């Protein structure tokens, strides 16, 4: 028997990690407070997700949110948790949530300098069947001197200060970036703390998996149809790509980050502007994927370069391993040239 203890006595928790990053940046501590408040909300949502069946949190709350999705009871709870925790961090001025039609302006006595865009419970249509769901967020600095308003949230993803997502799967995981790579943390239920499990994650240059909803194949444009066909029937005689699609974006994006490959939710005849929302779905995951060395595009430009015009704006999203995304873009350019 060695003398190695099964207990780590100098573990890097996410709380400690956030404080260290703040100290290195010689910041005011506001971003540290904000991230720690976000983590508290994520822990609370994780607990609610685990207890959902017992606590009668499954099912529909009886309303439809601003983007047309039926609101689940867990959606309502998660949204309230995130809003309350962020506003009580004394570091936010504007909040944009998938569940709220208009931006939420923090009251003057609790106001700080950050804007947060978030989806409190992504993939909530999967709640009742116990598939993985998640929370997504992106943090920006307020850039104007005016009174806080919705306009403060209409910033391109290049302005993101920090972004991440939580995945409530077989364990609860947080992927976080403050602009210096992507780190992964796992929730240790015994400690009630997120612990660093992987530092500076890098996506593979090329993967072996493609992920999209092929039920919409009837509506695909020529470029998407051609690309998917190439993955199924490779012209060079190589093995076809595997197909994986959960239907919960956080789960599909995280698998793409870990295993490589490509995730596609392109524009189609049914959703000509795309389906996923730019501010609180596409920008945060595009930021994470780019920080890990991948690419994220709308098919015409990098996602992070899109200048938002509305807080619930939708855009196409294609992301993943750089060589796979580049191959998709080659199909797009070829089809545009052939018109």
UniProtKB/Swiss-Prot annotation:
A motif (Nuclear localization signal) lies at residues 204-208. AMP binds at residues 18, 28-32, 113-114, 141. Pathway: Carbohydrate biosynthesis; gluconeogenesis. It is found in: Cell junction; Cytoplasm; Nucleus; Cytoplasm, Myofibril, Sarcomere, Z line. Its cofactor is Mg(2+). InterPro entries: FBPase_C_dom, FBPase_class-1, FBPase_N, FBPtase, Fructose_bisphosphatase_AS. Gene3D superfamilies: 3.40.190.80, Fructose-1,6-Bisphosphatase, subunit A, domain 1. Keywords: Calcium, Carbohydrate metabolism, Cell junction, Cytoplasm, Gluconeogenesis, Hydrolase, Magnesium, Metal-binding, Nucleus, Phosphoprotein. Subject to complex allosteric regulation. The enzyme can assume an active R-state, or an inactive T-state. Intermediate conformations may exist. AMP acts as an allosteric inhibitor. Fructose 2,6-bisphosphate acts as a competitive inhibitor. Strongly inhibited by Ca(2+). Substrate binds at residues 122, 213-216, 245-249, 265, 275. GO terms for cellular component: anchoring junction; cytoplasm; cytosol; nucleus; Z disc. Mg(2+) 3 binds at residues 119, 122, 281. Mg(2+) 1 binds at residues 69, 98. Its main location: other. Catalyzes the hydrolysis of fructose 1,6-bisphosphate to fructose 6-phosphate in the presence of divalent cations and probably participates in glycogen synthesis from carbohydrate precursors, such as lactate. PANTHER family: FRUCTOSE-1,6-BISPHOSPHATASE ISOZYME 2, FRUCTOSE-1,6-BISPHOSPHATASE-RELATED. Belongs to the FBPase class 1 family. Homotetramer. Interacts with ALDOA; the interaction blocks inhibition by physiological concentrations of AMP and reduces inhibition by Ca(2+). Interacts with alpha-actinin and F-actin. HAMAP family: FBPase_class1. This is Fructose-1,6-bisphosphatase isozyme 2.
């Amino acid at each position: 028997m060695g003398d190695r203890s099964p207990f780590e006595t100098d573990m890097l928790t996410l709380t400690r990690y956030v404080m260290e990053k703040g100290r290195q940046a010689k910041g005011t501590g506001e971003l540290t407070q904000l991230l720690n408040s976000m983590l508290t909300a994520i822990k609370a949502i994780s607990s609610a997700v685990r207890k959902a069946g017992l606590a009668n949190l499954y099912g529909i709350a009886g309303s439809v949110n601003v983007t047309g999705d039926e609101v689940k009871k867990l959606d309502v709870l998660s949204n309230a948790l995130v809003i309350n925790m962020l506003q009580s961090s004394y570091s936010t001025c504007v909040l944009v949530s998938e569940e709220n039609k208009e931006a939420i302006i923090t009251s003057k006595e609790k106001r700080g300098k950050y804007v947060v865009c978030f989806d409190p419970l992504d993939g909530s249509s999967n709640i009742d069947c116990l598939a993985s769901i998640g929370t997504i967020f992106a943090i920006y600095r307020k850039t104007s001197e005016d009174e806080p308003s919705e306009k403060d949230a209409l910033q391109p993803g290049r302005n993101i200060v920090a972004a991440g997502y939580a995945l409530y799967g077989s364990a609860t995981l947080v992927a976080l970036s403050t602009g210096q790579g992507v780190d992964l943390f796992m929730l240790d239920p015994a400690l009630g703390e997120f612990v660093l499990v992987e530092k500076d994650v890098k996506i593979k240059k090329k993967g072996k998996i493609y992920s999209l909803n092929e039920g919409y194949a009837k509506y695909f444009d020529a470029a998407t149809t051609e690309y998917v066909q190439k993955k199924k029937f490779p012209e060079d005689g190589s093995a076809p790509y595997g197909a994986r699609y959960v239907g919960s974006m956080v789960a599909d994006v995280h698998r793409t980050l870990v295993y490589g490959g490509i995730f596609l939710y392109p524009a189609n005849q049914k959703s000509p502007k795309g389906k996923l929302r730019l501010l609180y779905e596409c920008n945060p995951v595009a930021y994470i994927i780019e920080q890990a060395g991948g690419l994220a595009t709308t098919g015409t430009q990098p996602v992070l370069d899109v200048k938002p015009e509305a807080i619930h704006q939708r855009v196409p999203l294609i992301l993943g391993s750089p060589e796979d995304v580049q191959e998709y873009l080659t199909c797009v350019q070829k089809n545009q040239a052939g018109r």
